[in-house]
Amino acid sequence: MAFPEPKPRAPELPQKRMKTLDCSQGAVRAVRFNVDGNYCLTCGSDKTLKLWNPLRGTLLRTYSGHGYEVLDAAGSFDNSHLCSGGGDKTVVLWDVATGQVVRKFRGHAGKVNTVQFNEEATVILSGSIDSSVRCWDCRSRKPEPVQTLDEARDGISSVKVSDHEILAGSVDGRVRRYDLRMGQVSSDYVGSPITCTCFSRDGQCTLISSLDSTLRLLDKDTGELLGEYVGHKNQQYKLDCCLSERDTHVVSCSEDGKVFFWDLVEGALALALPVGSNVVQSLAYHPTEPCLLTAMGGSIQYWREETYEAEGGAG
């Protein structure tokens, strides 16, 4: 007799708080996982960038060199370098191991809201309130960007990179997708100022959050609206959104102190996770596991699924 095929495990959502870390760097403007999810970065209003092991709750290194608050950061694919951007209008390339500044890229006319490496970590992309996305060659000694994308009519709030494509969300209410191979740009008009954009992990869709307290899932190639997700509050702050590690759920920060999870296909609210009484400023989802980082005030919170048991106890 043949045994029935085991059903695929239903996705679990991270709702067990494992750790709260006081980052001691003023307000945490952004929290980001590194490429494999073992470490995380926090961006502080005190001009510092910090590298942590979030499960152990240990601070590994502090990076100092910005002249104003740090607003975003990212790690390279090989964990050797970091990039960051901030209120001082600069983009900084860091050596992870030494903590030293490798390069400072200047040229933006306003604060840098968002930074990303390309997949090879040879180029840093930065988006600024000056309405431009700039591409900086990490290996060149030239101070100018190798490319400037200036189609936006208002500040850039979010930049994401996938293979040969750049996704840029703007306060002008448009998401622009640049195909670098074809030299083409396509634009989807949402209307409300955009706070965050991201690609789905399968690369087929884009997720967009905006200041009308709505998230929208679009077909990447056609711009067709595939889903809308509401219930959270996002009316005045630049808040993060993302998809869960298996593209099963849409996840968003909220101004009412919660993180909201919706079923991607059904659009139904799956969980409103209470974090605290203030705005959930930033979040990051683990690349392969049901694990979430949130930032509120001066601390970050580390969340796992209910069934998770840390090695050696939860600490």
From Swiss-Prot:
Of which family is this protein a member?
Belongs to the WD repeat MORG1 family.
List localization entries: Cytoplasm; Lysosome; Nucleus
Q: Which InterPro entries match?
A: G-protein_beta_WD-40_rep, WD40/YVTN_repeat-like_dom_sf, WD40_repeat_CS, WD40_repeat_dom_sf, WD40_rpt, WD_repeat_MORG1
Which Gene Ontology biological process is one annotated for this entry? response to hypoxia
Q: Which keywords belong to this entry?
A: Cytoplasm, Lysosome, mRNA processing, mRNA splicing, Nucleus, Repeat, Spliceosome, WD repeat
| Protein name according to UniProt | WD repeat domain-containing protein 83
Q: Out of the domains of life, which is the source? A: Eukaryota
SUPFAM superfamilies (UniProt xref): WD40 repeat-like (SSF50978)
- Broad class of where this protein is predominantly found: cytoplasm
What does the annotation say about its assembly with partners? Interacts with EGLN3/PHD3. Interacts with ERK signaling proteins MAP2K1/MEK1, MAP2K2/MEK2, LAMTOR3, ARAF/Raf-1, MAPK1/ERK2 and MAPK3/ERK1. Identified in the spliceosome C complex. Interacts with PARD6B and CRB3. Interacts strongly with GTP-bound RRAGA but not with inactive GDP-bound. Interacts with p62/SQSTM1.
What this chain does, per the entry, is described as:
Molecular scaffold protein for various multimeric protein complexes. Acts as a module in the assembly of a multicomponent scaffold for the ERK pathway, linking ERK responses to specific agonists. At low concentrations it enhances ERK activation, whereas high concentrations lead to the inhibition of ERK activation. Also involved in response to hypoxia by acting as a negative regulator of HIF1A/HIF-1-alpha via its interaction with EGLN3/PHD3. May promote degradation of HIF1A. May act by recruiting signaling complexes to a specific upstream activator. May also be involved in pre-mRNA splicing.
Identify the tissues in which this protein is expressed.
Ubiquitous.
